[in-house]
Swiss-Prot record:
Protein name: Acetate kinase
Cofactors demanded by this protein: Mg(2+); Mn(2+)
Keyword terms of this UniProt record: ATP-binding, Cytoplasm, Kinase, Magnesium, Metal-binding, Nucleotide-binding, Transferase
Site residues (Transition state stabilizer), renumbered to this chain: H178, R239
Species this protein is from: Geobacillus kaustophilus (strain HTA426)
Principal location class: cytoplasm
Binding site for Mg(2+): N8, E382
NCBIfam families: ackA
Length: 396
């Protein structure tokens, strides 16, 4: 038995899960929020019970020390030596990483080199890696990249129709995100379908505050909706998704905003928040729409419409589809969005059951047994995917 920590470090947060492998049992999980503040919040779940403490946590290294001390204090481990491996989520691996990798100084250097592609996320992920190196220097650590799964996309999927040298000189191309999630749910779908993944054409819909769709053929990503950044693709909670690029200078001219300010609007004030004027939270929008708010209903329709179009596009791209998967916060829990997305797809063999579609947050088929195209809800488990990669790469 091995104990493996799965870590997701943000700029002021640290999410963690401790697994016993290979049984894949979750021993504990939690989050440290507001790192760098005097009122940081440490939350840990032990035996289903949530424990919380508000205290000063000056930096990520202090958060790591506190986490390990708590694991001992709550009797989850007896000493630091019981941690056999650590897996770190890293948002962007560029073209350098097509798989998870054991962390070395050279790997850290390469992650730093691609950090300009994810300036909000990669530096924070690296801070988490460094913090664990400081406290547990001899424990093998693995970097698991959100972009790696999509490195199997062919050129016709990942290239933009821009001057080719923009790709060769500046690395401008589609990278795609949520790869760890898309990989987990498509592998799980193959298990639930009882068919080898090599034979399947799957469309994975990761729908959370950030949302992306992936076409997965034979277990490999061949296209995905997000692009060079996570701003592209479908409309999201606060992100615009795809727009006409000529709108950026037009908006600058009309509003007097700078390019950076327009990008800020596209990232943080657009999507369902921008359309509804109410909220980026789908639960608020569903409630408002049910009460007759037309703009909330419009935001939901736009969100579903964009996903619906990607499903049709990817079915054409793969010359058919065997199953459609819904995952992440909205995909797992919103029967309203799933119904709007699936509406009208009968022409391609999608027949779904409104009763089965009431499922929330657990694995289920929501298509009729006779439906040629199966529809599944599969809660994502990126942390488990990270732990599995640690086991594989650290030979635990």
């Amino acid at each position: 038995m091995a104990k493996v920590l799965a870590i997701n470090a943000g700029s002021s947060s640290l999410k963690f899960q401790l697994f016993e492998m290979p049984a894949e049992t979750v021993l504990t999980k939690g989050v440290v929020e507001r790192i760098g503040f005097d009122d940081a919040i440490f939350t840990i779940v032990v035996n289903g019970e949530k424990h919380q403490e508000v205290t000063a946590i000056p930096d990520h290294a202090a958060a790591v020390k506190m986490l390990l001390d708590k694991l001992i204090r709550y009797g989850i481990i007896r000493s630091f030596d019981e941690i056999d491996g650590i897996g770190h989520r890293v948002v962007h691996g560029g073209e350098k990483f097509s798989d998870s990798v054991l962390i070395t100084e050279d790997v850290i250097k390469q992650i730093e080199e691609v950090s300009e592609l994810a300036p909000l996320h990669n530096p924070a992920n690296l801070v988490g890696i460094r913090a664990f190196q400081e406290v547990l220097p001899d424990v093998p650590a693995v970097a698991v990249f959100d972009t790696a799964f999509h490195q199997t996309m062919p050129e016709q999927s990942f290239l933009y129709s821009l001057p080719y040298e923009y790709y060769t000189k500046f690395g401008i191309r589609k990278y795609g995100f949520h790869g760890t999630s898309h990989k987990y749910v498509t592998q799980r779908a193959a298990e639930l379908l009882g068919r080898p993944i090599e034979q399947l054409r799957l469309i994975s819909c990761h729908l959370g505050n950030g949302a992306s769709i992936a076409a997965v053929e034979g277990g490999k990503s061949i296209d995905t909706s997000m692009g060079f950044t996570p701003l592209a693709g479908v409309a999201m909670g606060t992100r615009s998704g795809n727009i006409d690029p000529a709108l950026i200078p037009y908006i600058m001219e009309k509003t007097g905003m700078t390019a950076d300010e327009v990008i800020e609007v596209l990232n943080k004030k657009s999507g369902m928040l921008g359309l509804s004027g109410i909220s980026s939270d789908l639960r608020d929008l569903e409630k408002a729409a049910a009460e007759g708010n037309e703009r909330a209903e419009l935001a939901l329709e736009v969100f579903a419409n964009r996903i619906h179009k990607y499903i049709g596009s990817y079915a054409a791209r793969m010359c058919g589809v065997d199953a459609i998967i819904f995952t992440a916060g909205i995909g797992e829990n919103s029967e309203v969005v799933r119904a709007k997305v699936l509406r009208g797809l009968e022409f391609m063999g999608v027949y779904w059951d409104p009763i089965l579609n009431k499922v929330r947050g657990k694995e289920a088929f929501i298509s009729y047994p006779h439906s040629p195209v199966k529809v599944l809800v599969i809660p994502t488990n990126e942390e488990l995917m990270i732990a599995r990669d640690v086991m594989r790469l650290a030979n635990l």
